[in-house]
Amino acid sequence: MDFIMANTGAGGGVDTQAQLMQSAAAAAAVAATNAAAAPVQNAAAVAAAAQLQQQQVQQAILQVQQQQTQQAVAAAAAAVTQQLQQQQQAVVAQQAVVQQQQQQAAAVVQQAAVQQAVVPQPQQAQPNTNGNAGSGSQNGSNGSTETRTNLIVNYLPQTMTEDEIRSLFSSVGEIESVKLIRDKSQVYIDPLNPQAPSKGQSLGYGFVNYVRPQDAEQAVNVLNGLRLQNKTIKVSFARPSSDAIKGANLYVSGLPKTMTQQELEAIFAPFGAIITSRILQNAGNDTQTKGVGFIRFDKREEATRAIIALNGTTPSSCTDPIVVKFSNTPGSTSKIIQPQLPAFLNPQLVRRIGGAMHTPVNKGLARFSPMAGDMLDVMLPNGLGAAAAAATTLASGPGGAYPIFIYNLAPETEEAALWQLFGPFGAVQSVKIVKDPTTNQCKGYGFVSMTNYDEAAMAIRALNGYTMGNRVLQVSFKTNKAK
Protein backbone atom coordinates (compact mmCIF):
# COMPACT_ATOMS: atom_id res chain seq x y z
CA MET A 1 0.00 0.00 0.00
CA ASP A 2 2.87 2.33 0.68
CA PHE A 3 4.17 1.59 -2.77
CA ILE A 4 0.83 2.34 -4.31
CA MET A 5 0.45 5.52 -2.33
CA ALA A 6 3.95 6.62 -3.28
CA ASN A 7 3.29 6.17 -6.91
CA THR A 8 -0.01 7.93 -6.57
CA GLY A 9 1.63 10.83 -4.90
CA ALA A 10 4.31 11.07 -7.53
CA GLY A 11 2.16 10.67 -10.59
CA GLY A 12 -1.11 11.71 -9.15
CA GLY A 13 -3.30 10.08 -11.81
CA VAL A 14 -6.23 7.74 -11.51
CA ASP A 15 -5.11 5.68 -14.50
CA THR A 16 -1.73 5.03 -13.00
CA GLN A 17 -3.28 3.89 -9.77
CA ALA A 18 -5.59 1.46 -11.59
CA GLN A 19 -2.68 -0.03 -13.47
CA LEU A 20 -0.78 -0.55 -10.27
CA MET A 21 -3.76 -2.28 -8.70
CA GLN A 22 -4.07 -4.58 -11.70
CA SER A 23 -0.38 -5.47 -11.46
CA ALA A 24 -0.75 -6.30 -7.78
CA ALA A 25 -3.77 -8.47 -8.48
CA ALA A 26 -1.86 -10.33 -11.18
CA ALA A 27 1.05 -10.92 -8.84
CA ALA A 28 -1.31 -12.22 -6.18
CA ALA A 29 -2.92 -14.60 -8.70
CA VAL A 30 0.48 -15.97 -9.73
CA ALA A 31 1.40 -16.52 -6.09
CA ALA A 32 -1.90 -18.28 -5.44
CA THR A 33 -1.38 -20.52 -8.48
CA ASN A 34 2.09 -21.48 -7.32
CA ALA A 35 0.81 -22.18 -3.84
CA ALA A 36 -1.94 -24.47 -5.23
CA ALA A 37 0.49 -26.41 -7.46
CA ALA A 38 2.85 -27.26 -4.61
CA PRO A 39 0.64 -30.01 -3.00
CA VAL A 40 0.07 -31.64 -6.42
CA GLN A 41 3.80 -31.88 -7.03
CA ASN A 42 4.33 -33.33 -3.54
CA ALA A 43 1.62 -36.02 -4.11
CA ALA A 44 3.19 -37.04 -7.43
CA ALA A 45 6.55 -37.41 -5.74
CA VAL A 46 5.04 -39.59 -3.01
CA ALA A 47 3.29 -41.81 -5.60
CA ALA A 48 6.50 -42.22 -7.57
CA ALA A 49 8.37 -43.19 -4.43
CA ALA A 50 5.69 -45.75 -3.48
CA GLN A 51 5.78 -47.29 -6.96
CA LEU A 52 9.55 -47.57 -6.79
CA GLN A 53 9.34 -49.24 -3.39
CA GLN A 54 6.73 -51.73 -4.68
CA GLN A 55 8.97 -52.65 -7.60
CA GLN A 56 11.84 -53.24 -5.22
CA VAL A 57 9.66 -55.51 -3.04
CA GLN A 58 8.55 -57.52 -6.11
CA GLN A 59 12.14 -57.92 -7.22
CA ALA A 60 13.08 -59.15 -3.75
CA ILE A 61 10.21 -61.69 -3.78
CA LEU A 62 11.24 -62.88 -7.24
CA GLN A 63 14.80 -63.39 -6.08
CA VAL A 64 13.59 -65.44 -3.07
CA GLN A 65 11.41 -67.60 -5.34
CA GLN A 66 14.29 -68.20 -7.71
CA GLN A 67 16.48 -69.25 -4.79
CA GLN A 68 13.80 -71.65 -3.52
CA THR A 69 13.40 -73.17 -6.99
CA GLN A 70 17.12 -73.68 -7.31
CA GLN A 71 17.24 -75.32 -3.88
CA ALA A 72 14.31 -77.64 -4.76
CA VAL A 73 15.94 -78.66 -8.04
CA ALA A 74 19.20 -79.34 -6.26
CA ALA A 75 17.43 -81.43 -3.59
CA ALA A 76 15.55 -83.45 -6.23
CA ALA A 77 18.75 -84.07 -8.16
CA ALA A 78 20.45 -85.23 -4.97
CA ALA A 79 17.54 -87.58 -4.18
CA VAL A 80 17.62 -89.09 -7.68
CA THR A 81 21.37 -89.55 -7.43
CA GLN A 82 20.98 -91.26 -4.05
CA GLN A 83 18.23 -93.52 -5.38
CA LEU A 84 20.35 -94.53 -8.36
CA GLN A 85 23.24 -95.28 -6.04
CA GLN A 86 20.98 -97.44 -3.85
CA GLN A 87 19.68 -99.30 -6.90
CA GLN A 88 23.21 -99.89 -8.12
CA GLN A 89 24.18 -101.16 -4.68
CA ALA A 90 21.15 -103.49 -4.67
CA VAL A 91 22.11 -104.83 -8.11
CA VAL A 92 25.67 -105.41 -6.95
CA ALA A 93 24.40 -107.18 -3.82
CA GLN A 94 22.06 -109.36 -5.87
CA GLN A 95 24.86 -110.26 -8.26
CA ALA A 96 27.00 -111.18 -5.26
CA VAL A 97 24.24 -113.47 -3.95
CA VAL A 98 23.86 -115.16 -7.34
CA GLN A 99 27.62 -115.57 -7.59
CA GLN A 100 27.72 -117.09 -4.11
CA GLN A 101 24.92 -119.49 -5.02
CA GLN A 102 26.76 -120.53 -8.16
CA GLN A 103 29.92 -121.09 -6.15
CA GLN A 104 27.99 -123.19 -3.64
CA ALA A 105 26.42 -125.19 -6.45
CA ALA A 106 29.84 -125.74 -8.03
CA ALA A 107 31.23 -126.88 -4.67
CA VAL A 108 28.37 -129.35 -4.27
CA VAL A 109 28.94 -130.69 -7.78
CA GLN A 110 32.65 -131.14 -7.10
CA GLN A 111 31.96 -132.86 -3.79
CA ALA A 112 29.45 -135.17 -5.44
CA ALA A 113 31.97 -136.00 -8.15
CA VAL A 114 34.56 -136.91 -5.53
CA GLN A 115 32.10 -139.06 -3.63
CA GLN A 116 31.01 -140.76 -6.83
CA ALA A 117 34.62 -141.64 -7.60
CA VAL A 118 35.24 -143.09 -4.13
CA VAL A 119 31.95 -144.68 -3.09
CA PRO A 120 30.66 -147.60 -5.18
CA GLN A 121 27.33 -146.99 -6.87
CA PRO A 122 24.29 -148.68 -5.26
CA GLN A 123 22.41 -151.24 -7.22
CA GLN A 124 19.50 -149.99 -9.28
CA ALA A 125 16.17 -150.31 -7.52
CA GLN A 126 13.85 -152.99 -8.78
CA PRO A 127 10.89 -151.65 -10.75
CA ASN A 128 7.60 -151.31 -8.89
CA THR A 129 5.13 -153.97 -9.98
CA ASN A 130 2.03 -152.76 -8.18
CA GLY A 131 0.95 -150.45 -10.99
CA ASN A 132 1.83 -147.09 -9.45
CA ALA A 133 4.93 -145.00 -8.95
CA GLY A 134 5.17 -145.67 -5.23
CA SER A 135 4.34 -143.54 -2.26
CA GLY A 136 7.60 -141.63 -2.34
CA SER A 137 8.50 -138.97 0.20
CA GLN A 138 8.75 -135.23 0.24
CA ASN A 139 12.53 -135.24 0.35
CA GLY A 140 12.70 -137.68 -2.52
CA SER A 141 15.13 -140.05 -0.81
CA ASN A 142 12.91 -143.07 -1.40
CA GLY A 143 11.74 -142.12 -4.86
CA SER A 144 13.06 -142.84 -8.32
CA THR A 145 15.76 -140.83 -10.08
CA GLU A 146 13.06 -138.80 -11.80
CA THR A 147 11.51 -137.95 -8.42
CA ARG A 148 14.87 -136.87 -7.03
CA THR A 149 15.30 -134.39 -9.89
CA ASN A 150 11.73 -133.06 -10.06
CA LEU A 151 10.85 -130.16 -7.76
CA ILE A 152 7.53 -128.53 -6.96
CA VAL A 153 7.63 -124.78 -6.37
CA ASN A 154 4.73 -123.26 -4.40
CA TYR A 155 3.68 -119.68 -3.63
CA LEU A 156 5.05 -118.18 -6.84
CA PRO A 157 4.14 -114.54 -7.57
CA GLN A 158 1.07 -114.27 -9.80
CA THR A 159 2.98 -112.44 -12.55
CA MET A 160 6.02 -114.73 -12.67
CA THR A 161 6.53 -116.47 -16.02
CA GLU A 162 8.08 -119.80 -16.97
CA ASP A 163 11.10 -118.01 -18.42
CA GLU A 164 11.67 -116.20 -15.12
CA ILE A 165 11.37 -119.47 -13.20
CA ARG A 166 13.86 -121.10 -15.56
CA SER A 167 16.27 -118.19 -15.16
CA LEU A 168 16.09 -118.41 -11.37
CA PHE A 169 16.57 -122.16 -11.04
CA SER A 170 19.16 -122.49 -13.82
CA SER A 171 21.55 -120.54 -11.59
CA VAL A 172 21.89 -123.74 -9.55
CA GLY A 173 22.25 -126.29 -12.33
CA GLU A 174 21.16 -127.55 -15.73
CA ILE A 175 17.38 -127.75 -16.11
CA GLU A 176 15.56 -130.30 -18.22
CA SER A 177 12.07 -128.77 -18.09
CA VAL A 178 9.96 -126.10 -16.40
CA LYS A 179 6.17 -126.10 -16.16
CA LEU A 180 4.04 -123.33 -14.65
CA ILE A 181 0.55 -124.55 -13.77
CA ARG A 182 -2.20 -122.28 -15.08
CA ASP A 183 -5.96 -122.08 -14.69
CA LYS A 184 -7.33 -122.82 -18.15
CA SER A 185 -10.73 -121.37 -17.26
CA GLN A 186 -9.27 -117.92 -16.50
CA VAL A 187 -7.85 -116.03 -19.49
CA TYR A 188 -4.71 -114.06 -18.72
CA ILE A 189 -3.43 -111.29 -21.02
CA ASP A 190 0.23 -110.40 -20.62
CA PRO A 191 0.25 -106.61 -19.91
CA LEU A 192 3.75 -106.33 -21.39
CA ASN A 193 2.70 -108.10 -24.59
CA PRO A 194 -1.08 -107.82 -25.14
CA GLN A 195 -0.80 -109.26 -28.65
CA ALA A 196 0.65 -112.54 -27.39
CA PRO A 197 -1.66 -115.58 -27.24
CA SER A 198 -3.74 -115.54 -24.08
CA LYS A 199 -2.89 -118.05 -21.36
CA GLY A 200 -4.59 -119.25 -18.25
CA GLN A 201 -3.87 -117.31 -15.09
CA SER A 202 -1.05 -118.69 -12.97
CA LEU A 203 -2.17 -120.85 -10.05
CA GLY A 204 0.95 -119.89 -8.13
CA TYR A 205 2.89 -123.14 -8.39
CA GLY A 206 4.90 -125.11 -10.91
CA PHE A 207 7.50 -127.82 -11.45
CA VAL A 208 11.22 -127.69 -12.21
CA ASN A 209 12.98 -130.85 -13.38
CA TYR A 210 16.78 -130.90 -13.17
CA VAL A 211 19.16 -133.08 -15.16
CA ARG A 212 21.18 -134.08 -12.07
CA PRO A 213 19.73 -135.02 -8.66
CA GLN A 214 22.45 -133.12 -6.78
CA ASP A 215 21.39 -129.89 -8.51
CA ALA A 216 17.79 -130.47 -7.44
CA GLU A 217 18.89 -131.02 -3.84
CA GLN A 218 21.04 -127.90 -3.95
CA ALA A 219 18.10 -125.88 -5.31
CA VAL A 220 15.96 -126.99 -2.36
CA ASN A 221 18.68 -125.95 0.08
CA VAL A 222 19.40 -122.60 -1.58
CA LEU A 223 16.07 -121.40 -2.98
CA ASN A 224 13.51 -122.69 -0.48
CA GLY A 225 12.22 -119.68 1.49
CA LEU A 226 13.46 -117.16 -1.06
CA ARG A 227 11.49 -113.90 -1.02
CA LEU A 228 10.16 -112.97 -4.49
CA GLN A 229 8.08 -109.80 -4.82
CA ASN A 230 5.39 -110.22 -2.13
CA LYS A 231 5.71 -114.00 -1.79
CA THR A 232 8.05 -116.43 -0.05
CA ILE A 233 8.42 -119.45 -2.32
CA LYS A 234 8.46 -123.03 -1.08
CA VAL A 235 10.74 -125.46 -2.94
CA SER A 236 10.53 -129.19 -2.27
CA PHE A 237 10.82 -132.51 -4.06
CA ALA A 238 7.75 -133.49 -6.06
CA ARG A 239 6.29 -136.86 -5.21
CA PRO A 240 5.26 -139.59 -7.63
CA SER A 241 1.57 -140.19 -8.10
CA SER A 242 -0.09 -142.67 -5.77
CA ASP A 243 -3.52 -143.42 -4.35
CA ALA A 244 -2.44 -142.01 -0.98
CA ILE A 245 -1.89 -138.52 -2.36
CA LYS A 246 -4.48 -138.40 -5.15
CA GLY A 247 -7.59 -136.32 -4.57
CA ALA A 248 -6.17 -134.32 -1.68
CA ASN A 249 -7.39 -131.00 -3.11
CA LEU A 250 -10.35 -129.36 -1.35
CA TYR A 251 -12.85 -126.78 -2.57
CA VAL A 252 -14.01 -124.31 0.09
CA SER A 253 -16.89 -121.84 -0.33
CA GLY A 254 -18.76 -119.45 1.94
CA LEU A 255 -15.58 -117.67 3.00
CA PRO A 256 -15.63 -113.99 4.00
CA LYS A 257 -14.84 -111.72 1.07
CA THR A 258 -11.94 -110.19 3.02
CA MET A 259 -10.31 -113.46 4.13
CA THR A 260 -6.59 -113.77 3.45
CA GLN A 261 -4.64 -116.82 2.34
CA GLN A 262 -2.95 -117.04 5.75
CA GLU A 263 -6.33 -117.06 7.54
CA LEU A 264 -7.58 -119.82 5.24
CA GLU A 265 -4.52 -121.97 5.96
CA ALA A 266 -4.92 -121.38 9.70
CA ILE A 267 -8.36 -123.05 9.55
CA PHE A 268 -7.07 -126.20 7.82
CA ALA A 269 -3.55 -126.49 9.27
CA PRO A 270 -4.60 -128.66 12.28
CA PHE A 271 -5.66 -131.48 9.94
CA GLY A 272 -2.40 -132.06 8.07
CA ALA A 273 0.42 -130.69 5.96
CA ILE A 274 -0.83 -128.08 3.48
CA ILE A 275 0.99 -128.23 0.15
CA THR A 276 -0.60 -125.14 -1.36
CA SER A 277 -3.61 -122.87 -0.92
CA ARG A 278 -5.44 -120.34 -3.02
CA ILE A 279 -8.30 -117.85 -2.73
CA LEU A 280 -10.09 -116.67 -5.88
CA GLN A 281 -9.82 -112.90 -6.25
CA ASN A 282 -12.40 -110.61 -7.79
CA ALA A 283 -11.21 -109.16 -11.10
CA GLY A 284 -10.27 -105.51 -10.67
CA ASN A 285 -10.73 -105.61 -6.88
CA ASP A 286 -7.68 -106.49 -4.80
CA THR A 287 -9.45 -106.02 -1.47
CA GLN A 288 -12.30 -108.52 -1.91
CA THR A 289 -12.36 -112.16 -2.96
CA LYS A 290 -15.06 -114.38 -4.44
CA GLY A 291 -15.44 -116.17 -1.11
CA VAL A 292 -14.09 -119.36 -2.67
CA GLY A 293 -10.75 -121.06 -2.05
CA PHE A 294 -8.76 -124.26 -2.49
CA ILE A 295 -6.59 -126.24 -0.07
CA ARG A 296 -4.26 -129.03 -1.22
CA PHE A 297 -3.16 -131.41 1.53
CA ASP A 298 -0.20 -133.75 1.50
CA LYS A 299 -2.42 -136.82 1.73
CA ARG A 300 -6.02 -137.64 0.94
CA GLU A 301 -6.72 -138.88 4.47
CA GLU A 302 -5.82 -135.43 5.80
CA ALA A 303 -8.27 -133.83 3.38
CA THR A 304 -10.93 -136.32 4.47
CA ARG A 305 -10.46 -135.38 8.13
CA ALA A 306 -10.81 -131.70 7.24
CA ILE A 307 -14.09 -132.31 5.39
CA ILE A 308 -15.59 -134.28 8.27
CA ALA A 309 -14.56 -131.67 10.83
CA LEU A 310 -15.22 -128.42 8.96
CA ASN A 311 -17.98 -128.88 6.40
CA GLY A 312 -21.09 -127.00 7.53
CA THR A 313 -19.34 -125.36 10.49
CA THR A 314 -18.55 -121.70 11.15
CA PRO A 315 -14.86 -121.20 12.02
CA SER A 316 -13.92 -118.29 14.27
CA SER A 317 -12.61 -116.27 11.31
CA CYS A 318 -15.88 -116.74 9.36
CA THR A 319 -19.34 -115.29 9.74
CA ASP A 320 -21.30 -118.05 7.96
CA PRO A 321 -21.01 -121.84 7.72
CA ILE A 322 -18.50 -122.95 5.10
CA VAL A 323 -18.82 -125.72 2.53
CA VAL A 324 -15.80 -128.05 2.29
CA LYS A 325 -15.60 -130.80 -0.32
CA PHE A 326 -13.19 -132.55 -2.62
CA SER A 327 -12.41 -130.45 -5.68
CA ASN A 328 -13.37 -131.68 -9.16
CA THR A 329 -14.62 -135.03 -7.90
CA PRO A 330 -18.39 -135.31 -8.50
CA GLY A 331 -20.19 -136.93 -5.60
CA SER A 332 -17.04 -137.68 -3.63
CA THR A 333 -18.11 -135.59 -0.68
CA SER A 334 -21.36 -137.50 -0.28
CA LYS A 335 -19.42 -140.74 0.25
CA ILE A 336 -18.11 -139.36 3.53
CA ILE A 337 -20.86 -137.17 4.91
CA GLN A 338 -24.32 -136.14 3.85
CA PRO A 339 -24.15 -133.00 1.72
CA GLN A 340 -25.42 -129.90 3.47
CA LEU A 341 -27.16 -127.02 1.81
CA PRO A 342 -25.45 -123.64 1.91
CA ALA A 343 -26.53 -121.63 4.93
CA PHE A 344 -28.31 -119.00 2.88
CA LEU A 345 -30.73 -121.53 1.33
CA ASN A 346 -33.36 -121.18 4.04
CA PRO A 347 -37.03 -120.49 3.33
CA GLN A 348 -36.81 -116.88 4.50
CA LEU A 349 -33.94 -116.01 2.19
CA VAL A 350 -35.30 -118.11 -0.66
CA ARG A 351 -38.38 -115.94 -0.60
CA ARG A 352 -36.14 -112.90 -0.98
CA ILE A 353 -34.17 -114.49 -3.80
CA GLY A 354 -36.92 -115.88 -5.98
CA GLY A 355 -40.23 -114.47 -4.82
CA ALA A 356 -43.08 -116.57 -3.43
CA MET A 357 -42.14 -120.10 -2.42
CA HIS A 358 -44.59 -122.80 -3.49
CA THR A 359 -45.09 -126.35 -2.32
CA PRO A 360 -43.15 -128.93 -4.36
CA VAL A 361 -45.34 -130.73 -6.89
CA ASN A 362 -45.13 -134.57 -6.97
CA LYS A 363 -42.00 -134.36 -4.78
CA GLY A 364 -40.30 -132.53 -7.60
CA LEU A 365 -38.10 -129.46 -7.44
CA ALA A 366 -39.60 -126.55 -5.49
CA ARG A 367 -40.52 -123.51 -7.53
CA PHE A 368 -39.14 -120.21 -6.32
CA SER A 369 -41.13 -117.93 -8.61
CA PRO A 370 -43.92 -118.33 -11.17
CA MET A 371 -41.39 -118.07 -14.00
CA ALA A 372 -39.07 -120.52 -12.30
CA GLY A 373 -41.92 -122.95 -11.79
CA ASP A 374 -43.01 -122.84 -15.40
CA MET A 375 -39.46 -123.36 -16.63
CA LEU A 376 -38.80 -126.26 -14.24
CA ASP A 377 -42.12 -127.89 -15.11
CA VAL A 378 -41.11 -127.82 -18.76
CA MET A 379 -37.54 -129.01 -18.13
CA LEU A 380 -38.43 -131.60 -15.45
CA PRO A 381 -42.11 -132.55 -15.89
CA ASN A 382 -41.87 -135.64 -13.68
CA GLY A 383 -40.27 -133.95 -10.72
CA LEU A 384 -37.03 -134.97 -9.08
CA GLY A 385 -37.21 -138.52 -10.44
CA ALA A 386 -37.05 -137.20 -14.00
CA ALA A 387 -34.21 -134.92 -13.01
CA ALA A 388 -32.21 -137.85 -11.68
CA ALA A 389 -32.92 -139.83 -14.82
CA ALA A 390 -31.83 -136.89 -16.94
CA ALA A 391 -28.51 -136.67 -15.11
CA THR A 392 -26.99 -139.28 -17.39
CA THR A 393 -27.69 -137.15 -20.46
CA LEU A 394 -26.63 -133.93 -18.74
CA ALA A 395 -23.22 -135.35 -17.81
CA SER A 396 -21.95 -135.06 -21.37
CA GLY A 397 -20.15 -131.76 -20.74
CA PRO A 398 -16.35 -131.47 -20.71
CA GLY A 399 -14.82 -133.43 -17.85
CA GLY A 400 -18.22 -134.69 -16.67
CA ALA A 401 -19.44 -131.17 -15.94
CA TYR A 402 -23.10 -130.14 -15.86
CA PRO A 403 -23.68 -127.12 -18.13
CA ILE A 404 -26.30 -124.55 -17.11
CA PHE A 405 -27.96 -122.10 -19.50
CA ILE A 406 -28.64 -118.55 -18.23
CA TYR A 407 -30.90 -116.27 -20.28
CA ASN A 408 -31.97 -112.59 -20.11
CA LEU A 409 -28.61 -111.24 -18.97
CA ALA A 410 -27.97 -107.50 -19.23
CA PRO A 411 -25.59 -106.32 -22.01
CA GLU A 412 -23.02 -105.13 -19.47
CA THR A 413 -22.89 -108.48 -17.65
CA GLU A 414 -19.37 -109.85 -17.12
CA GLU A 415 -18.25 -113.39 -16.29
CA ALA A 416 -17.23 -112.35 -12.77
CA ALA A 417 -20.91 -111.73 -11.97
CA LEU A 418 -21.82 -115.34 -12.82
CA TRP A 419 -18.87 -116.64 -10.80
CA GLN A 420 -20.21 -114.74 -7.79
CA LEU A 421 -23.77 -115.85 -8.46
CA PHE A 422 -23.14 -119.60 -8.84
CA GLY A 423 -20.02 -120.02 -6.68
CA PRO A 424 -21.86 -120.35 -3.35
CA PHE A 425 -23.81 -123.36 -4.65
CA GLY A 426 -20.79 -125.56 -5.36
CA ALA A 427 -17.74 -126.16 -7.52
CA VAL A 428 -17.88 -124.09 -10.71
CA GLN A 429 -15.61 -125.36 -13.48
CA SER A 430 -16.09 -122.63 -16.05
CA VAL A 431 -18.15 -119.56 -16.94
CA LYS A 432 -18.80 -118.21 -20.42
CA ILE A 433 -20.65 -115.05 -21.43
CA VAL A 434 -21.64 -115.01 -25.11
CA LYS A 435 -20.74 -111.59 -26.51
CA ASP A 436 -21.49 -109.71 -29.70
CA PRO A 437 -18.15 -109.41 -31.55
CA THR A 438 -19.03 -105.95 -32.86
CA THR A 439 -20.05 -104.36 -29.55
CA ASN A 440 -18.19 -106.71 -27.16
CA GLN A 441 -21.32 -106.76 -24.98
CA CYS A 442 -23.29 -109.71 -23.69
CA LYS A 443 -25.87 -111.01 -26.18
CA GLY A 444 -28.23 -111.81 -23.33
CA TYR A 445 -27.18 -115.31 -22.38
CA GLY A 446 -24.30 -117.37 -21.04
CA PHE A 447 -23.27 -120.73 -19.64
CA VAL A 448 -21.96 -122.03 -16.31
CA SER A 449 -20.50 -125.54 -15.90
CA MET A 450 -20.68 -127.09 -12.44
CA THR A 451 -18.94 -130.24 -11.22
CA ASN A 452 -21.74 -131.81 -9.22
CA TYR A 453 -25.26 -132.49 -10.48
CA ASP A 454 -26.98 -131.92 -7.12
CA GLU A 455 -25.27 -128.55 -6.77
CA ALA A 456 -26.19 -127.57 -10.32
CA ALA A 457 -29.84 -128.49 -9.72
CA MET A 458 -29.78 -126.54 -6.47
CA ALA A 459 -28.43 -123.47 -8.26
CA ILE A 460 -31.17 -123.73 -10.90
CA ARG A 461 -33.85 -124.02 -8.24
CA ALA A 462 -32.61 -120.94 -6.40
CA LEU A 463 -31.62 -118.69 -9.30
CA ASN A 464 -34.30 -119.35 -11.90
CA GLY A 465 -36.48 -116.25 -11.61
CA TYR A 466 -33.84 -114.36 -9.65
CA THR A 467 -33.74 -110.62 -10.40
CA MET A 468 -30.27 -109.50 -11.41
CA GLY A 469 -30.18 -105.75 -11.87
CA ASN A 470 -33.53 -105.03 -13.49
CA ARG A 471 -33.79 -108.37 -15.33
CA VAL A 472 -35.42 -111.62 -14.27
CA LEU A 473 -33.10 -114.52 -15.12
CA GLN A 474 -34.17 -117.78 -16.73
CA VAL A 475 -31.85 -120.56 -15.54
CA SER A 476 -32.02 -124.19 -16.70
CA PHE A 477 -29.86 -127.13 -17.64
CA LYS A 478 -28.36 -126.71 -21.07
CA THR A 479 -29.99 -128.89 -23.72
CA ASN A 480 -29.21 -129.53 -27.35
CA LYS A 481 -31.65 -126.78 -28.26
CA ALA A 482 -29.77 -124.14 -26.23
CA LYS A 483 -27.47 -122.16 -28.47
Curated annotation (Swiss-Prot):
Cystine bridges:
none
Q: List GO molecular-function terms, semicolon-separated.
A: mRNA binding; mRNA regulatory element binding translation repressor activity; poly(U) RNA binding; RNA binding
Q: Which PROSITE patterns match?
A: RRM
What cellular component terms from Gene Ontology apply here? Answer: Cajal body; nucleus; ribonucleoprotein complex
Location of the RRM domain: 149-240, 248-329, 402-480
> Could you tell me where the Low complexity compositional bias lies?
120-144
Record-level GO BP terms: central nervous system development; embryo development ending in birth or egg hatching; germ cell development; negative regulation of mRNA 3'-end processing; negative regulation of oskar mRNA translation; nervous system development
Q: Could you tell me which residues belong to the region Disordered? A: 120-146
| Keywords of this entry | Repeat, RNA-binding
Query: Would you identify the family this protein belongs to, as annotated?
Result: Belongs to the RRM elav family.
Q: Which NCBIfam families match?
A: ELAV_HUD_SF
What the protein does comes down to: Required for the proper development and maintenance of neurons presumably by affecting RNA metabolism.
- Please report the name of this protein according to its UniProt entry: Protein elav
